[in-house]
Amino acid sequence: MRPLTDEETRAMFEKLSKYIGENIKLLVDRPDGTYCFRLHNDRVYYVSEKILKLATNIARDKLVSFGTCFGKFTKTQKFRLHVTALDYLAPYAKYKVWVKPGAEQSFLYGNHVLKSGLGRITENTSQYQGVVVYSMADVPLGFGVAAKSTQECRKLDPMAIVVFHQADVGEYIRHEDTLT
């Protein structure tokens, strides 16, 4: 477990800023304590200073997980967000997409969101912008990337892809053995 290097921090914050913009500072400067990001086994964990001090008493090879896993670095040093970060991304999301009840199950199985399943979309969402996907009851389901802008979505045919799937809460069941 170690602090992130400058390149790792930059890569992670660039990815997070696609979803929550300037609200990144709200993740670190919280009223309930100081939180930080730490790297362990190529995974980035979001952890309070209090838990971090307790985790230093455990040997590095015995430590499986601590805090909340936000994502991991690939072998090419690109940062990939995990679904475990959804609870922290959803309240601060700048761009949101709501899916109809019939399209929820399809999204939770790992499929993209089609125009026919789109309930609402935040105004001024640009193409390839990171979005958090919600059910119509405002329950966060996952996140993805907008395939089309808000303006283009109005003119699309029903079978066109609106949001590219990246992660969803169904991964807790599909990949339960690899999530830490």
UniProtKB/Swiss-Prot annotation:
Region (C-terminal domain), start-end ranges: 93-180
Entry GO CC: nucleolus; preribosome, large subunit precursor
A GO term for molecular function: RNA binding
UniProt xrefs under InterPro entries: NIP7_N, Nip7_N_euk, PUA, PUA-like_sf, PUA_sf, Ribosomal_synth_fac_NIP7, UPF0113_PUA
Protein location: Nucleus, Nucleolus
Superkingdom, taxonomy of origin: Eukaryota
GO process annotations (BP): ribosomal large subunit biogenesis; ribosome assembly
PROSITE patterns, per database record: PUA
Family statement: Belongs to the NIP7 family.
Record function comment: Required for proper 34S pre-rRNA processing and 60S ribosome subunit assembly.
Subunit comment: Monomer. Interacts with pre-ribosome complex. May bind to RNA. Interacts with NOL8. Interacts with FTSJ3.
Name this protein carries in UniProt: 60S ribosome subunit biogenesis protein NIP7 homolog
Organism, as annotated: Xenopus laevis
